[in-house]
Each structure stands twice: as structure tokens, then as C-alpha cells.
Amino acid sequence: MSPRGQFEGKSNEFITIVITIIIAVSGVSGALIGSLFRPNQSADSFVDEPFGDPLPIRFESQPFADYEEYETDFTLNVSSYDINSDLSNIINLDSFSYLPENARNAIVDHYFFAVPSNFKMFADIYCMNDDYELPSFVTSDSVLHAYHVLYDLALREIEETHFMNHIGNLSRHMVNVSLDQYNLLESDLWRALAKKNAAFFSVAAKLHDPDWTVPDPVTGWVYQTLHFIENAGGFTTDWFMNQRLDFSQFIPRGHYTRTESLKRFFKTIMWLSRVAFRVQPDDDGLTAEQNAERAENETGQAVLLCRAFEQPSHLFIDGETPLRLWRELYDTTSFFVSTSDDLTVDEYLTIFNAIYDDPVNIVELCNRTKLGTFIATARESRSPQIISGWVWDSQSINVTKGLRFMGQRFVPDSYMFSELTHAAVKYRMMPKALDVMAVLGSQRAWDLLDDQKDYLNYTTQMNRLKETYGDLNLSNWTQSLYWSWLYSFKTLLDEPELGHPSFMLTDQWIDKQLTTCLGTWTELRHDTILYAKQSYSQTYGASYPPPGYVEPVPKFYAKLASLCRMMLQGLDSRGLVVDDFTERLVRLHDLLREFQVISEKELSQTPLNATEWSLLENIGGILAHIEGTYNEGGRAALVADVHTDPMSGKVLEEATGNPMVILVAVPNEEDKVFLARGAMYSHYEFAWPMSERLTDEAWWQMLEEESAPSMDDWMGSFVLGISETSDLSASHNAYNDPEMRRNSSSKAYRNVMPIAIDVRKMAKPT
């Protein structure tokens, strides 16, 4: 299986779907696909498959915004330095007299260390530096976190001020038109399909507005389904479309727990994105003939849905507004995240308009031969790439192919997970975040995955993914904000060369950067939890120190600044600009450009000017302004489930905790060494029951109660206080052990609560 067509080199068209369906002409027009009717059945019952040849269709779209990368210009010229065993060559040691022996040893050995803290926000650490007149070490973590805050805020603002109304009006319009179709159609079969559409959109309308009155014809279906959504218990087929749907996905999480409005929006979009109108299902317990009939029924619903977009209702008297609203929502979220992994409304409308000459004509709309052509054409369209539901390892992913009204998006990390778990990698049911980092180029991540390499086909699959993603060009990597975020931070996985500061040339710094990438990736998954398509395993001295030091990664700052510019231009082009947010994003963009220049000077041993020193002196207040208030930015700690294993009923949770304090021995312009203090991510990975998918609030409580899992043991190379043997490594391996998985009472299989580590007092100056 190859990755999405986004890999084919089309210039940064994040919503581009350019697909040419190549049709093999059989030489016999109207080839028999299957008998239209069963013998002795009424003409209102679909059976087998109707006649029809697929049509050649081309789908195109336009880019939302362009990406243009800032250039960097520097020469690596930093002299190496060592730390005296008694730290006597650190010119501001008096400011850190509280450091215990293990912290001092870490500075001597590898120039820096990190410790957990009780700080709730990154900016708090830098503001305390200002208060205590301590030099700030400006980390890549701090600006990545600032970008996350603004990305999340922008998405939240747009959802509440624009999309909440859009999706409500669109759902109610589709209910009204579907009921009109139900009353107008003469065929009992097609009336039943219109009724199911009315129920489908009534669920969405009721989730959006609890006070909305459900129409009488579909009341029973709708309230039964709402019961499953509210209980969020897991997989069931006991609802009106009889698909096996994972209702645990309806637990609001991410930023969608902030307000009741966002909770309702989350459930509404989740409903519209998870249910498929499939073209070739293979459902359990059904014969091939029955599955073919189900494909025809669901595709018939899709045909009526396409027609409904152009029908008037009392909400929209024209035939253009519904599709315009859908496109505004879809295109904007595609800009933030990615294009749909499943076939979209636009793609189905293209097929619909190519097949039906007069869609207003009900007789033609119900034409069985045209429906057969529709099914054949849709089956020849692009396939999904990410398994996101219950699929047996003996089945093709194409059993999920079909229309989803607001399909979840193809994101590369979910694709990596789907290609590195069962059935692509036999019996590996849970992936690891390190999988993503290894594919993105981290040799250290690959080394840390040694215990996974015994899985059959794991190394082969990993090498294939490395080659695939290694061949991507700039246009591929910058097709959306999500992709560009990955592109920006993967620069940090490059191993530093001679000429970088000594602290960057240590093995421990490579671990620090890997932790940074895991932290920002977790924030990315948290922010897009509603839209990103989640993967599923298939079943089965006397001198005074300078005011600060910028982590010298100029290429990273250039890429993140370019991403900010792309985001600004994309939102402005759609009139989605919020004044306060825009001002803060512009400030982050400008700050990143300044950090790029400062880090280029640091690497080239060029003195900073007074303006640049002033910037570092005030970095706490600047970052605090960008992050916003506690209510806007929230606690830095967050959690997101990124993969589901239906067999064990577990999800893989990725989380960041409170920001850690990092102390680094850095050089000044006079080749002297001083300690600078900054903030960095903490990162956690653990399995959790799918019926209890964690919210941020539940995760915060675990942190407060010190019942959170421990960080992975390899982070102990630079984080003081991590135990020698991580509970996570043992429990993660247990989840992937078939014998252990069958014995859920096994100690290693249960979620392990770590011991509390009392090192946080070191994070605060005395």
C-alpha cells in the first residue's frame, strides 16, 4: 500500500485531490456486474450489483495558502569548552548555589540537565528568570509551545464563531430536504434510504442543539443512536445503519472540553466524520449477496445526499449555500490539518454530475443502471490509506471505502502507525511515538526501538516508510499547517556537527531534542484530535552573565516562522482573521525571525547588539503575551489518544506534563561559560482503556495526585529523578504480547502508577 496521492509532488495544494481513474475497457459496453434483482423479489429490493461501467473522473482543488521558506545564513564557528569538576569556570554559579551533587555532576558530564517542575505554563519559568535576574535559555520547546497555543486558539475561535452555526444549519437543511425526498419518492426502497438520511442528519442536528425537535418519522432511530453516543461504550452495530461503529470516539477531549458549545461541536463533527456510505462493505454475518445489497443501499443514500445539496429548503432557498458552507468548513480544516482520507462530498458530487443528466428528475435519480455506474466509478476512485475502525486482518481496507460527510483527515503519523501495527506487522497491536520519530529521521529513536525489531516485518515496514518520507519534497511537507508543523520540528532530529556549542554535541542533547519533538507532536495530535484520522490495529567569573542564550537552531526558527506566515496568509485569504490572535501570531513570527538571527550570530561567534540583548532580557513577558492568559492557553499539560487496539479495548495515550526546567552551561561572547535556565517539554506514553479516553482535565488530576505513569527510562539520560527501569517500557511490551494480552489481570498488563520523585524543588531558585 502506498501513501496518499499527496506524495505525488503536486505543489503545496493541501486540499488537492488530483486523481485520474484509469478505466480498463472490457470491449463490451454495459458489462454485467451482477444480476439486478433476486428472483421472486419485488423491484424495490436491491440485490447483487446493478449494471454499470465506471466513468473516468478528474478531481481538482485550489491551494489555501503558499509556503515560502526563509533562508538561513551562518557558519559553524563555536569553540569547544569544558566544565571544571568544581564548576569554578561558570561565571554565575552563585545564582545556582542550591544545586545538589547529581545536578552538578550532570553539568560537568554533559553540560545540562532537566528536572520536573510544578510550573503550569512555559512562560512562568521565564518570568521567574526575570524576577530573579537569571539568564534565560530560550528553548525550541518554548516557541513550539507558543505556536501550539496560537494554533489551538485559532482553531477554537473559528469553530465557535463560524463552524458551529454552519454545521447546525447544514444538518437541519439536510434533514428537511431528506424528509422532502422521503415524502416525494414513490419507491418504498428509495423512501427507506431517504428516511435513513433524515435520521443520520437528525442525529447531527440534535447533537448540535439539544433543544431541537427530532422529526416523528425517525424519532426511534435517532434517540437509540444518541443513547450509544452518550454512553460512549465502544463498538456496536445496534443502530439504524447496522455498521460496527466505535462509540467511545464520542468522548469529547482536546480543547473541546472547554465549553458546552465545543463539546456539542465535537460530537456533531465526530458523527458526521465516522459514519460511511460504503461501496463495498464486508460486514460480519452477511453473505456476499447481502453485502452487495448493503453497498447499494448506502450508495443510494449517498446519491440522495448529493441531490440534497442542490435542493432548496426553508433554511436555504438557493442551491448554492449548502455546498458553500460545507466547502468553507472542509477547506479551512484541510488547511489546518489535511485532506480527507475518505472520499468527499466534492468527489461524490463530481461523479453524481457526470452520471445524472437531470438530477431533479426523480425517475432518473432512482435509475438502477445509473446507480450501478455510480458504484463502479466510486469503487475505482482512490482508496483510504488509514484503517480507522474494526477491520479483520483478512479484509482489504477497501471494505471501508465510501463517502463520509466530513471525513477525518489523512495525516502521515497515523499512516505510519497503521503500517507498523497488525496486520502490516503481525501481532504488534500498539505502536510507539518513537515510530514516528524514527520515520522522520531520528537514529536515536530507531536505536531505542530495538525491543520492537523482533516483530515480523517491522524492520522492513520501517525501512519502506523511511524511504517514502525521505523522498518527499518541500511541496509535500507544506501542504497544510499540520504537515508543515511536522516539517518544522523534524529539523531538531538532525544531529549537530562540530562547530555547535559543546552541550549540543552530547548524546544527552540528542535525547533532549527527541523529547522536544515528542512533546510538540503530542500537542499537534491534541489540537487536531477531532479531525486527524486515528489509526486502528487490525483485529487480531567576575563577569556578569549575559541576559540569556537562544538554543542555536536557526533552520528550525526559519521553518517555524515560515509556517506562521503561511498560517497568517491562509486565514487572511478566507476572512478568518481575529485581531488579538493575529497580533500575537505576527509577534511570534517576528520573534522567530529574531531568534533565527540571534542563533546564527551565536553559531558564527558574532556579538549580539543592544536590541537583541534587550529582547532576551524581556523574554518572559514576551512569551507570556503570546501564550495569553491561563484561560486562553491553559495548562501546558495535555493528553491525546492517537491509536486504538480494538482487540484489547485499549488506546495509546500521548501526554505532556508540566514543563520541565532545563539548566544549560552555555558559552558567552568572551568564551566564558554561564548557566542559563529555560523550559522544555515533559512527555508520557501509556495505554489506557478505550472506554475511558482521557480528557485534559482527567490528566491534570492524575498529575496533581502523582498517579501519572513515569516518563520513559531513556529520558533519564538528562532528566534527574527518572527511575532506572521505566514501568512504561515493560507495560508497553506487555500490550503487544499476545499471551499477556489474553491475561488482562497480569501485573505488567495493568496501567502502572509510578512513584513520586521529589526533585521539583530544584526547579525553583532559592
Identify what each model region corresponds to:
Residues 39-765:
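Long, non-catalytic protein-protein interaction scaffolds
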